[in-house]
Amino acid sequence: MSLLDTLQRGLADLDAQGLRRVRRTADTACDAHMTVDGREIVGFASNDYLGLAAHPALIAAFAEGAQRYGSGSGGSHLLGGHSRAHATLEDELAAFSGGFSDAPRALYFSTGYMANLAAMTALTGKAATIFSDALNHASLIDGMRLSRANVQVYPHADTAALAALLDASDAETKLIVSDTVFSMDGDLAPLAELVALAERHGAWLVVDDAHGFGVLGPQGRGALAAAALRSPNLVYVGTLGKAAGVAGAFVIAHETVIEWMIQRARSYIFTTAAPPAVAHAVSASLKVIAGDEGDARRAHLAALIERTRALLRNTRWQPVDSHTAVQPLVIGSNDATLAAMRSLDAHGLWVPAIRPPTVPVGTSRLRVSLSAAHSFDDLARLEAALIEASEAQAVQKAAA
């Protein structure tokens, strides 16, 4: 059988299981109201939690950065591509979210995937053991596989199970790794307990705050700041394409850790640096996030979250107990979840269907992603459409 035959058979299998992914094409800027595939929709799919992706100040900064630095960086960070915009942003990020360390330093990456690969591979090796939450992001898992470290997976958020694994380990280097906000359930990691376990066992704790940075904590400084946690053995990863509304990611840790990553993190060294204009726009985003406007947007988002938690309970499906902008609604089968997504789409609402392998088999769900750009009228439309779709499925199930 040829490679093409194998791939075509694989695609047919995905179709039969309701697992093929389909891209949709946005014709306008990312916002609560946008044009997608030529249709006006209300989007509940993006991670633009503060509604900054189309903010005039960020757009102006992007244009200013392109005018000053050009359209591309021209090289890797170690071979001519590291600009003043990158350096300034790293200093700003360390000052903004590095309060957990006495000597914080930040390192800017082009994507969150690359930042997580760097943290997993540069800080470990064959003599290390990584202790990973079962629901960690795929980029962390891929980084662990590349690291050559021994990986032990503990049940989701189960600190007792983690403690038992740590007690039994004699590894030279121990790394506890966890998302802060879990992207498909919206729940929060037990960060205080994880920090305590790391300190008790001489381990390091790496946290991926992709869905917390900009939203959680005072001024949006992130999940560690929200929990008022400090420790010398922390490595903090954040992304800049979600709440920050631009692109890229960063790692903050003790300055020695960051210097080592500059020397050894392959996903930092062997790639062209992001355009300086992107970093310049992120600097503008940090000003909005940290200011009064950022506080107002977070307050509005918090109100939207509470309203959404209530309205999801009015459906026939199973909401997940989330207090974050990620609000999942578990339906179960792939076919039923896709049918629900199509029903919402007919009402001009874009709510993506999340299926295996992203979530466990039998837990396919709608993932409602909230933004400060949404209004309560948007939520009223969502509630009506969800109730209609869930009632229709209940009737069909009863008649079957």
From Swiss-Prot:
Cofactor(s) needed for function: pyridoxal 5'-phosphate
GO MF term set: 8-amino-7-oxononanoate synthase activity; pyridoxal phosphate binding
Amino-acid positions noted as binding pyridoxal 5'-phosphate in the UniProt annotation, renumbered to this chain: G112, Y113, S183, H211, T239
GO biological process, one term: biotin biosynthetic process
Residues annotated for substrate binding in this entry: R21, H137, T358
One Pfam family linked to the record: Aminotran_1_2
Keyword vocabulary terms for this entry: Biotin biosynthesis, Pyridoxal phosphate, Transferase
Domain of life: Bacteria
Known EC number: 2.3.1.47
UniProt keyword annotation of Disulfide bond present: no
Entry-linked InterPro entries: Aminotransferase_I/II_large (IPR004839), AON_synthase_class-II (IPR050087), AONS_Archaea/Proteobacteria (IPR004723), AONS_Proteobacteria (IPR022834), PyrdxlP-dep_Trfase (IPR015424), PyrdxlP-dep_Trfase_major (IPR015421), PyrdxlP-dep_Trfase_small (IPR015422)
Catalytic activity: 6-carboxyhexanoyl-[ACP] + L-alanine + H(+) = (8S)-8-amino-7-oxononanoate + holo-[ACP] + CO2
Record PTM N6-(pyridoxal phosphate)lysine, positions in chain: K242
Pathway: Cofactor biosynthesis; biotin biosynthesis
Subunit structure: Homodimer.
Family note: Belongs to the class-II pyridoxal-phosphate-dependent aminotransferase family. BioF subfamily.
Described purpose of this protein according to its UniProt entry: Catalyzes the decarboxylative condensation of pimeloyl-[acyl-carrier protein] and L-alanine to produce 8-amino-7-oxononanoate (AON), [acyl-carrier protein], and carbon dioxide.
Designated name of the protein: 8-amino-7-oxononanoate synthase
Lineage: Bacteria, Pseudomonadati, Pseudomonadota, Betaproteobacteria, Burkholderiales
